[in-house]
Amino acid sequence: MTRNSASRETIDVLIDNAKSTMSYSEQLLQNAELIKSKFSEHHITHYLQLLFELLSGSLSAIYEVCSDIKNMLSTENVYTKRFHMQMINLSQYELSVYLVGRDQGGVISELITYLNKSHQDSKELEDILQQVKLLGEQCDIRLRNVTAHYDNPNTMYTMLTTLNDEDVYVKRFGNQLLIHDKILKYISSVLQIITEKLSPDKKNCTYKKSVEE
């Protein structure tokens, strides 16, 4: 198992940050799902529906991968590490498919289409889309397929023995965090604009979020 030399202190910080991010993501995800559950009760634009699908999808993936990163770094058992690498690969690939879509039908792709039809700026989302595509391209699709379908365990176990560099998955998680941060900033700015339009007297209020890096 390959790992660049990192102090125990550095590893512990990564584990603690993963725990904090999981806690934060879980709380925000609950709020997002609650809002989505109200969509059927009120008239709401397709754009806002997609916006909250983007939020909940990214939060779910962050929670899943944080859990696997934490568990991967917390153990010295090589087989346990490989299992969590396998699950990180699966989660990140599924995130890419959900946001991009196999035929450009993912959540971000739909948001961009909506904005373009409305003659509104989609540059920020297009930048996020490209980064999500790169993340998906870094995933092992064959490993994802045998993991998701589990119809050929011998092939899966053989592939797992080739997973030896946990640094690859830590770095890829770093890329995912950057994408997630951009998604949060985009959604936050949109919601702030909506709030200001609904409550003109509150234009000067500021919104702060605390995310464990």
Language-model features, listed with the residues they occupy:
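Amphipathic alpha-helical interface segments
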Residues: 1-138, 163-213
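Histidine-centered, metal-coordinating catalytic motifs and their short helical/loop contexts
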Residues: 129-160
